[in-house]
């Protein structure tokens, strides 16, 4: 019984460390949510989608966004590449 608990604990620790390592490699501004903002503009932009692990296009309204907002795919990939 004690060996099973230790094995389970090791698995959990390994998973936690691997998640921490991946998130540490991605710049913090790239982990922000894709924010359309509160204005009604229509500006195609790119942002890093953490769940997909890549830059994706989204529509930015023109104000109140965040730093995960790039004018083109290349800028996003250069800033958020792992």
From Swiss-Prot:
It holds the Pfam family Kunitz_BPTI. Keywords: Disulfide bond, Hemostasis impairing toxin, Protease inhibitor, Secreted, Serine protease inhibitor, Signal, Toxin. Expressed by the venom gland. Transmembrane segments: none annotated. Residues 30-80 form the BPTI/Kunitz inhibitor domain. GO terms for cellular component: extracellular region; extracellular space. Disulfide bonds join 30-80, 39-63, 55-76. One of its GO terms (biological process) is venom-mediated suppression of fibrinolysis in another organism. The record marks 40-41 as: Reactive bond for trypsin. Residues 1-24 form the signal peptide. It is found in: Secreted. Belongs to the venom Kunitz-type family. This is Kunitz-type serine protease inhibitor Bt-KTI. It comes from Bombus terrestris (Buff-tailed bumblebee). The lineage of its organism: Eukaryota, Metazoa, Ecdysozoa, Arthropoda, Hexapoda.
């Amino acid at each position: 019984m004690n060996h099973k608990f230790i094995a389970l604990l090791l698995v959990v620790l390994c998973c936690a460390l691997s998640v921490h390592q991946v998130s540490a490699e991605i710049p913090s501004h790239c982990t922000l949510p894709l924010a359309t903002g509160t204005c009604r503009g229509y500006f195609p932009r790119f942002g890093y989608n953490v769940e997909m692990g890549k830059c994706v296009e989204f529509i930015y309204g023109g104000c109140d966004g965040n730093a995960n907002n790039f004018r083109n795919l290349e800028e996003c990939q250069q800033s958020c590449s792992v």
